[in-house]
Amino acid sequence: MSKVLFINASPVANEASFSYQLAKTFESEYLKLNPSDQVSWLDLNELDKGSMTLTSKNSKEHFKDENVDPLINQIKSVDKLVVIAPMTNFNYPATLKNWLDKICVANKTFSYKYSKKGGSIGLMDHLKVMIINTQGAPEGWYAFADVTVLLKGVFEFIGAMVDSIKVAGTKVEYLNKQPKEIVEPNLALIKEKAKNF
């Protein structure tokens, strides 16, 4: 039995969020294949620490154990992480950045101690991560802002194995469609990813 944690970083209300609807479908398909797995959700929009941005004025406070350990221990306690991360102004949402700043902590989720070549060693090698990303523009329009690539790099840095589901063109290809309507044309991909997760 695996423990799966869904991280919702969408700044859009659930019923209007393309990425959230894809994630709920992924959850449903995943549980059909893994009915005994335990699923929980963390909505970063509801997390007080999710709105605490790292600045020069609060860096000591930001990295205090009581601020980072609960979030780090939460991902250490699960086997799989599903990250809902729509492109927002050419990046992932600010709440996700704030959360990542709290879980990417030296000697807790990565280390330089035992590296032979001066690089880092990820300490979260037990973790499988599925990134669910949507963007309004078609694929390739904004190569400098590929949220999936950015997040893949961050999670691989801490040692995780990473896969992704990306749906591009929600403001073009899927224009005038409701979030639930983008699930159907992407259902085969979602089922395939759920099967291999």
From Swiss-Prot:
Binds 1 FMN per subunit. Its cofactor is FMN. It is an enzyme of class 1 (oxidoreductase). FMN binds at S10, S17, F18, S19. Pfam families: Flavodoxin_2. It comes from the Bacteria. Its EC number is 1.6.5.-, 1.7.1.17. It catalyses: 2 a quinone + NADH + H(+) = 2 a 1,4-benzosemiquinone + NAD(+); N,N-dimethyl-1,4-phenylenediamine + anthranilate + 2 NAD(+) = 2-(4-dimethylaminophenyl)diazenylbenzoate + 2 NADH + 2 H(+). Gene3D superfamilies: 3.40.50.360. One of its GO terms (molecular function) is oxidoreductase activity, acting on NAD(P)H as acceptor. Keywords: Flavoprotein, FMN, NAD, Oxidoreductase. HAMAP family: Azoreductase_type1 (MF_01216). PANTHER family: FMN-DEPENDENT NADH-AZOREDUCTASE 1, FMN-DEPENDENT NADH:QUINONE OXIDOREDUCTASE. Quinone reductase that provides resistance to thiol-specific stress caused by electrophilic quinones. Also exhibits azoreductase activity. Catalyzes the reductive cleavage of the azo bond in aromatic azo compounds to the corresponding amines. Belongs to the azoreductase type 1 family. Homodimer. This is FMN-dependent NADH:quinone oxidoreductase. It comes from Mycoplasmoides gallisepticum (strain R(low / passage 15 / clone 2)) (Mycoplasma gallisepticum). The gene is azoR.
